[in-house]
Structures are given as C-alpha cells and as structure tokens.
C-alpha cells in the first residue's frame, strides 16, 4: 500500500480553514492512491490560495484569465515520476485550491466546505496521476467514475455532507 506524504500550506486569508480539513485531505490522497493501486511512497503538495492568485496562475498556465476552483501541476508523465532524493518518495505534483471558489461551490451545491475540499483534492490527485476530463468523452466519464468511487469509499458520496464535529 502506498504511503502519501501530503504537504499542505495556506497562503490566503479570505476563508477560514475548517478544523480537521488537513486530515481529511490526507485521507483523500491516500484513498486515491489506494484505489489506483499505487504501491510506492508518494508526495503531494497542496496550497490554499486566493481567487486573485489562482486567476493569475490560470492565465499564466492555461491562458484563461478567470479564477477557477483548483489547478493541478503534475510532475510526472505516463506514470514516470522523479523521486525525492532524501526520502525516495515519488513526487506526484502540486495542487492549488482557491478557498473562495471552494466556499462558493459548496454553497452552490448545498454541501459543506469540507465535502467540497475533499472532492477537489480527489479530483486533483487523479489529474496528478494522468486522468483528464478537458476533452470530454470517455476520458471524462472514466475520471468522474474514479472520483465517485474514491469519495464513496470515504463516505463522501454526492448526497453526503461531511461535517467534522
């Protein structure tokens, strides 16, 4: 079984980070890797940022001058990843999440911010592993199925509203 080291940082002040969210995100990363049969130690970096910052990154890397909910920056290609020279863990990539967008989407979809962050984490780790949905079609269907499978394993299917009490 893969062991995921998840490095989480907060570089925004607009939205309070919910209690327990870091543990939930680590569980999400671990669940994706487990579901995908990933067997080696791996590292993922996740950073919470503002709408302004994610808009700038979206413009720079995707030529879309608008805020988005999440961006994934895979460090591997075709299942080949560099290793952390100190730990030997595979470096999967970096994820940035707009907390403002996540909060808006949680409200729009009628579930908790925790559930939205869990979804965005699962979605993004799948991107780091090579899944895509941009062109639609069967790739999009397959990615959505993987998301729902992982979230269901975590008890966070679409009708669930995770609240850490």
Name every feature range the model reports, one short phrase each.
Residues 1-118, 126-165:
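An acidic/histidine-cluster motif and surrounding catalytic segment
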């Amino acid at each position: 079984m893969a062991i995921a080291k998840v490095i989480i940082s907060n570089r925004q002040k607009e939205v309070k980070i919910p209690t327990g969210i870091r543990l939930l995100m680590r569980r999400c990363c671990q669940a994706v890797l487990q579901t995908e049969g990933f067997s080696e130690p791996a590292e993922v970096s996740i950073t919470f940022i503002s709408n302004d910052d994610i808009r700038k990154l979206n413009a720079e890397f995707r030529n879309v001058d608008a805020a988005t909910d999440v961006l994934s920056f895979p460090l591997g290609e075709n299942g080949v990843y560099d290793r952390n020279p100190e730990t030997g863990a595979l470096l999967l990539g970096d994820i940035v999440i707009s907390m403002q967008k996540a909060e808006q989407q949680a409200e729009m979809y009628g579930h908790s911010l925790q559930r939205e962050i869990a979804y965005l984490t699962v979605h993004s780790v799948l991107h780091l592993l090579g899944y895509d949905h941009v062109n639609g079609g069967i790739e999009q269907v397959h990615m959505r199925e993987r998301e729902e499978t992982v979230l269901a394993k975590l008890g966070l299917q679409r009708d669930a509203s995770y609240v850490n009490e």
